[in-house]
């Protein structure tokens, strides 16, 4: 019934005053809507003069600047025609080297805001200020403030104006010095101030420094059409044909009339299945049928225990390159800090695990040094573990001199340092010289800095029967020299095996005592044999006990003790059996 009354009322208003007024259909408000639109939709079309409350979506407002207002049905249709206008926020404006000159924070559709550039900067049009407009999709543009162009540096040329700074798009004319010309062969030229500075450098060139066409390369070419002439510092780029890879710089540069070294185009070989030492490809059995593969392919792999990839992980990617697989050594040995034993020193680094070819530093305690005489050193993780165990050894102190004096004033010496010394008058070293040198080694000095009186030297050591010295004999031996003796086989050395030179004479030499030779002939004469042995000939040293027993069918004719004979300097008393 209400709907019928609304229709009759609408027709009556439309025909009032004899004028036909067009009713308004339900308003489809872009970026907004009527309040209670589901209930109100039934009462449309509406007569002119009707008003309805409506709201706008987020980031949109009514023409009055509110988030809601009234929309009015007029004879020309709905008013306002655009109920919801887009808003733009001042906070969305990013301006470097400038600032917004207005105080408002929100702007509606088609509203303009002004911005100013800082001193020394200008808009893209060369002005100190500009404007942006709020459009349907936001601000028309982000404001830009760019720097002015200063007077450039001239090379073999001079400016034709006296200005010191230039606005965007300003032109600066310059002329070349006598004998020089611009890149186009002219003696004058111009540069333009752009957003990134001057269009080019105001440079003039000596024509003798120009280059001809760049050199050709096998399986490759330049990326641009070659010219007949190139100016100094011109650059030309090369590229390779398909299946070739560029090696070296892809650019050549003209300098002093010559081009720099051009690159090479290397054939890209395929890669065979990678046999990874101490590791494997993931899913290698599945992947193996797809090899060889082209350059640029990569595969994941893992390393065995105690091995890692070059990046320090247990897995990584191996890459096919024109030179083969990379990394060339996919799995590297690791070394542990705990495997290092260092006496009188300490490791100066905190890491506990090191990969192949990685160095670790160590330091020696005060008063100790490395084998090279330094306070610190390094060892390297190799395929079989650490390169060496670090060593810290003590310095050599000033030695005690005998009949001699040092030729330097130092008090301590590093490993491999040399100390020169000289003998007192009337004394000489072992080789007959009056000066000598000693070297600081790991166990101390190489020898004592001792000089001798020639009357205290000895000749060759005395010979002994059935024995000899263990070293080649010298003509002369210095005091306290020692020579070692040894006996022939089966002879027993009696006494000290060394003799010493003292006051020109050798100490008492040792003797070589004869062995006892037990023969089958002597045993047969006495009807005896060796106890527990089947030897027919036996050698015994002095002091050795030889046990005998009667042969089968014979009885002892001497005492029981005689069957345990003792060898005395080659003589033995045999027992007898009858």
UniProtKB/Swiss-Prot annotation:
Keyword Signal set for record: yes
GO biological process: complement activation
GO molecular function, one term: lipid transporter activity
Post-translational modification as stated in the protein's UniProt record: Glycosylated.
Glycan attachment residues as annotated in the record: 127, 186, 206, 374, 433, 453, 557
PANTHER family: COMPLEMENT FACTOR H-RELATED, COMPLEMENT FACTOR H-RELATED PROTEIN 3-RELATED
Function: Involved in complement regulation. Can associate with lipoproteins and may play a role in lipid metabolism.
Protein name from the UniProt record: Complement factor H-related protein 4
Gene: CFHR4
């Amino acid at each position: 019934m209400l709907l019928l009354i609304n229709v009759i009322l609408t027709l009556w208003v439309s025909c009032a005053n004899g004028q036909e007024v067009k009713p308004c259909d339900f308003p489809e408000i872009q970026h907004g809507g009527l309040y209670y639109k589901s209930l109100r939709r039934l009462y449309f079309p509406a007569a002119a003069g009707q008003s309805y409350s409506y709201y706008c979506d987020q980031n949109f407002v009514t023409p009055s600047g509110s988030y809601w207002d009234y929309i009015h049905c007029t004879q020309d249709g709905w008013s306002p025609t655009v109920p919801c206008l887009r808003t733009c926020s001042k906070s969305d404006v990013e301006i470097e080297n400038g600032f917004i000159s207005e105080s408002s924070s929100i702007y509606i559709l088609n509203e303009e805001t002004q911005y100013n550039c800082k001193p020394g900067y200008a808009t893209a049009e060369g002005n100190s200020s500009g404007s942006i407009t709020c459009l349907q999709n936001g601000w028309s543009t982000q404001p830009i403030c760019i720097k002015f162009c200063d007077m450039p540096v001239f090379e073999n040329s001079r400016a034709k104006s006296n200005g010191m700074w230039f606005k965007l798009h300003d032109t600066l004319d310059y002329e070349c010095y006598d004998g020089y010309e611009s890149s186009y062969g002219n003696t004058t030229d111009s540069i333009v101030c752009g957003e990134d500075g001057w269009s080019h450098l105001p440079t003039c060139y000596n024509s003798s420094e120009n280059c001809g066409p760049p050199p050709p390369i096998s399986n490759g070419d330049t990326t641009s059409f070659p010219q007949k002439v190139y100016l100094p510092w011109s650059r030309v780029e090369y590229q390779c044909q398909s299946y070739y890879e560029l090696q070296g710089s892809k650019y050549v540069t003209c300098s002093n009339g010559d081009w720099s070294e051009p690159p090479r185009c290397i054939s890209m070989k395929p890669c065979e299945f990678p046999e990874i030492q101490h590791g494997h490809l993931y899913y290698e059995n599945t992947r193996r049928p797809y090899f060889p593969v082209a350059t640029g392919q990569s595969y994941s792999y893992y390393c065995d225990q105690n091995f890692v990839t070059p990046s320090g992980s247990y897995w990584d990617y191996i890459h096919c390159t024109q030179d083969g697989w990379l990394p060339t050594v996919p799995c590297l040995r690791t070394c542990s800090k705990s495997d290092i034993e260092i006496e009188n020193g300490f490791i100066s680094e905190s890491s506990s695990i090191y990969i192949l070819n990685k160095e670790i530093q160590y330091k020696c305690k005060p008063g100790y040094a490395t084998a090279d005489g330094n306070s610190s050193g390094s060892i390297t993780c190799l395929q079989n573990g650490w390169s060496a165990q670090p060593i810290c050894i003590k310095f050599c102190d000033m030695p005690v001199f005998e009949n001699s004096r040092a030729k330097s004033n130092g008090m301590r010496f590093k490993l491999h340092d040399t100390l020169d010394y000289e003998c007192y008058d009337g004394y000489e070293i072992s080789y007959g010289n009056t000066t000598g040198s000693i070297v600081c080694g790991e166990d101390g000095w190489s020898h004592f800095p001792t000089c001798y009186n020639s009357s205290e030297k000895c000749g060759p050591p005395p010979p002994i029967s059935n024995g000899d010295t263990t070293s080649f004999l010298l003509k002369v031996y210095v005091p306290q020299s020692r020579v070692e003796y040894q006996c022939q086989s089966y002879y027993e050395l009696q006494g000290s095996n060394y003799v010493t030179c003292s006051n020109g004479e050798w100490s008492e030499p040792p003797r070589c005592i004869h062995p006892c030779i037990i023969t089958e002939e002597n045993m047969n004469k006495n009807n005896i044999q060796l106890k527990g042995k089947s030897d027919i000939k036996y050698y015994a040293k002095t002091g050795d006990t030889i046990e005998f027993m009667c042969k089968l069918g014979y009885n002892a004719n001497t005492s029981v003790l005689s069957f345990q004979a003792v060898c005395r300097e080659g003589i033995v008393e045999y027992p007898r059996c009858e």
